[in-house]
Amino acid sequence: GISLCLDVVMNHTADTHEWAVRAKRGEQEYMDRYQCYETREIPDQFEKTMPQVFPETAPGNFTWCEEMHRHVLTTFYPYQWDLNYHNPKVFNEMIGNILYLANMGVEVFRIDAVPYIWKELGTNCRNLPQVHSIVRMLRMILEMVCPGVILKGEVVMEPKELPVYFGTEQEPECHMLYGVSSMVNLWAALATRDTRMLKHQMDVIHSLPKNCYFVNYLRCHDDIGWGLDEEQEKKLEIDPIQHKEYLYHFFEGTYPYSFARGELYNYDPVTKDARSCGTTASLCGIEKGGFEGDLEQVKQGIQRVLMMHAACMSMEGFIMLSSGDEIGQVNDYDYKKNPDIAADSRYLHRSLFR
């Protein structure tokens, strides 16, 4: 049968959500469910240590709300208001919603953006100890009420930050995590023809306890963020910044020898950070070969796709296919015709299934 998996967006609600609407009306109970400030004093303190997730498309971590005359914490986009887990009502409401959905038959919950849910001044507001306390409480309650339900964590962080989200055998947290580091290292190995970083990543995974179970994938609805293990890169005498620049330019198709056709996402000229977008088929060379009418390039692209999927499926864990990968779907550039999403290159691989 089919087990239904639903997203639980732990970090924020839309600004059109009932809570946000009531907060805009000035209802204090609902204003307290977000982090709202009358002046820039505290927001400016947060900004000193809190990185920006989308510096190009959504700069800053706060948004002015005219209705409330408050600055609202918005880590991701201005229309996504961060929840205030310092207020226990937020956790209680969240677990109530999860249990309601579990009672309706949902068997897997994908907890979204979980590393960001706890905020403290003077920190980067990511991966803080309180985050793990909240996930642990969530797991404990699910095990008591609906022990068959699976908790899947979306933790897109540096490799060293991932294992702790499984918790320990005595105090478990997530049942499963996305294999982000494995995915990134697969694509890096394809571009550089250097498997040393990938081998290191496999060694790390095989050294983890048996309770660490990953969802393995090549592509998803989001970008590829080049979060490689910088310490290991340095040990291998690889410059992390130059390596990252090479990778995102390779998959953008900048180099004449590159077979990929992708686009950059959120390029930051200061840090030289950028992410890559595109479907598996386009990043592996099928689109380029087809556009140029080169059958040999297409065949090589198909072989790359098969090799990448074979490598992914050989890893211990649960395999996930992104919609369109099963038919070799290429990039869809029509998103650029829509002014609402034209600046978001992730829609390059978020097309209709066809």
Question: What is the predicted function of each stretch?
Answer:
Residues 1-354:
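Active-site and adjacent substrate-binding regions of carbohydrate-active enzymes
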